[in-house]
Swiss-Prot record:
The gene is FIT3. This is Facilitator of iron transport 3. Its main location: secreted. GO terms for biological process: siderophore transport. GO terms for cellular component: cell periphery; extracellular region; fungal-type cell wall; fungal-type vacuole; side of membrane. It comes from Saccharomyces cerevisiae (strain ATCC 204508 / S288c) (Baker's yeast). Residues 183-204 form a propeptide. It is found in: Secreted, Cell wall; Membrane. Residues 1-18 form the signal peptide.
Length: 204
C-alpha cells in the first residue's frame, strides 16, 4: 500500500513540473464535429473526499468532469447555432399551399436549409378587404358610422377636459413677489392687497 502511494505521489510531482495540462475535447452534434482545446493548471492537486483518495485519480476525475461539462456546453452551442440557421432560412419560401376556410386562410410555408426541411403554418383573416389608396379606403366588415361616433365622443371628451383644466387654472391665484425701491432701501412685498397697502404707505 505504501509503495503504490509513493508512485502516485511521484506521478503527481512529475505532472506538477509540467505546469499545465492541455486537453482536447471532441463533441458531435447533428453530424457536425466540434473540438475545443483546454489548458489547465497542472499544479492543482485535488485531495479527494477522504484521506485515502489518491491525488492522481482525483485529478483525473476532475478532468473528466470538466471534459463532460465542456462537451455539454459545446453541444448546446451547436444546437443554438442550428436553431439560428433555421430561423434565417424560414425567410426563403420555396413552396406554399393556400387553403381557404371561409373567414380565414391557412398557408403552409416550406423551406429547406442544409438538408433540413422546415414548415410553418400561418392563419390569416379572410375578411380583410383593401380597396386602394383613394378616399374610399374601407376595412370590411366594420362599419364607418361606428368608428366616426367613437371619434366624435372621444373629441368631445377631450374638449371638456381641456375646458375644465383651463377654468381651474383661471380661478387659481398665485402669490407673486415684486420689488419696490423706496428712497431709503429696497422693500419686497406681495402683489395682493397687503402689498398694495404697503406700497401706498411708502409712496406717501
Amino acid at each position: 500500500m505504501k509503495f503504490s502511494s509513493a508512485l502516485v505521489l511521484s506521478a503527481v510531482a512529475a505532472t506538477a513540473l509540467a505546469e499545465s495540462i492541455t486537453t482536447t475535447i471532441t463533441a458531435t452534434k447533428n453530424g457536425h464535429v466540434y473540438t475545443k482545446t483546454v489548458t489547465q493548471d497542472a499544479t492543482f492537486v485535488w485531495g479527494g473526499e477522504d484521506s485515502y483518495a489518491s491525488s492522481t485519480s482525483a485529478a483525473e476525475s476532475s478532468a473528466a468532469e470538466t471534459s463532460a461539462a465542456e462537451t455539454s456546453a459545446a453541444a448546446t452551442t451547436s444546437a443554438a447555432a442550428t436553431t439560428s440557421a433555421a430561423e434565417t432560412s424560414s425567410a426563403a419560401e420555396t413552396s406554399s399551399a393556400d387553403e381557404g376556410s371561409g373567414s380565414s386562410i391557412t398557408t403552409t410555408i416550406t423551406a429547406t436549409k442544409n438538408g433540413h426541411v422546415y414548415t410553418k403554418t400561418v392563419t390569416q383573416d379572410a375578411t380583410f378587404v383593401w380597396t386602394g389608396e383613394g378616399s374610399s379606403n374601407t376595412w370590411s366588415p366594420s362599419s364607418t358610422s361606428t368608428s366616426s361616433e367613437a371619434a366624435t365622443s372621444s373629441a368631445s371628451t377631450t374638449a371638456t377636459t381641456t375646458a375644465e383644466t383651463s377654468s381651474s387654472a383661471t380661478s387659481s391665484s398665485t402669490a407673486e413677489l415684486s420689488s419696490y425701491t423706496g428712497a431709503a432701501d429696497a422693500i419686497t412685498a406681495g402683489t395682493g392687497l397687503m402689498g398694495a397697502a404697503l406700497a401706498a404707505v411708502m409712496l406717501l
